[in-house]
Regions:
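Intrinsically disordered, low-complexity segments enriched in small/polar residues
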Residues: 1-188
Length: 188
């Protein structure tokens, strides 16, 4: 399986990564088209297991999970401290929340157990990480041992479209490690 993810550079180095996209059974000579949009969405869940709808987010924007007469709600709350980040503030009087960041409607990153008056901060470089792993599901939080084996970072800065080419694999003495590179790059 081919796993594609991003790293939240606003978090500590040990922050868990989420398998944003998992490509299965892609045979030799096959391709698997996908888009990597610029936009993000955010969502949150409270300590009661209630989940908010995903809201469109722009870098620099802050959101807050706050009580309302209809229950806990996630709403835009102006701008955060940095134009490179999306922030989710826990404005509930009690109870921790989880904040999630999505790209193309798929889970991209998560920050758990955010206490009242604390916030989750999401910041991503314009790059993806890609590698090969088994038994990973899309949206799964990956442990650091798996992430450390996926060390190919591909910068998407200024790229409109490209092909990611995978080489390597096979069995026996002639097998080679998997590698990934960009080809047929079209710049913006």
């Amino acid at each position: 399986q081919i796993v594609i993810f991003q790293k939240n550079v606003a978090s500590d180095l040990d922050a868990p990564a989420v398998a944003w996209r998992v490509i299965k059974y892609c045979g030799q000579g096959d391709n698997h088209p996908f888009t990597f949009p610029l936009g993000l969405q955010v969502g949150a869940s409270d300590s009661h297991g209630n989940c908010t709808p995903q809201l469109e987010a722009q870098y620099g924007q802050q959101f807050q999970m706050a009580p309302s007469t209809a229950g806990d709600r996630l709403t835009p709350a102006g701008y955060g401290a940095s134009s490179k980040e999306v922030q989710v503030l826990n404005a509930l009087p009690q109870g921790a929340i989880n904040a999630s960041c999505y790209k193309d409607g798929r889970l991209l990153a998560v920050k758990t157990a955010i206490a009242p008056r604390q916030k989750a901060v999401f910041e991503f470089k314009p790059s993806i990480w890609i590698g090969v792993a088994s038994h990973i599901q899309q949206g799964q939080i990956m442990n650091s041992a798996i992430v450390s084996q996926m060390n190919t970072e591909i910068s998407l800065l200024g790229i409109s479209r490209a092909d990611i080419v995978m080489r390597g694999g096979g069995s026996g003495a002639n097998s080679r490690p998997f590698s990934f590179s960009l080809e047929n790059v079209v710049m913006c």
